[in-house]
């Protein structure tokens, strides 16, 4: 798997593509977590189930790095770090054109499509 950017005995960091889901949902689409479990099972020739804990998620339309725990102990420790705000997350936006301002706030509404389990930005009335 060429999307892995970091792996040790405790953690694995993977590049998530836009459109993928991190964990299973009602759509039935194959989640990234299952792909990583399969990779670990094959790489380490593990019999039975493979533990993989989701430390955080990214929304379906978002691409970026997702961190998974390979052990329950590392999952617990990472959850504690996130809970206590010891981890800093940074988001970057890719835009078609250069924004007019360096900083700003976007105010819009989200409309949920229950069937697709997706949300879309809608115009304010």
Question: Where are the model-predicted features located?
Answer:
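RNA pseudouridine synthases
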Residues: 1-125
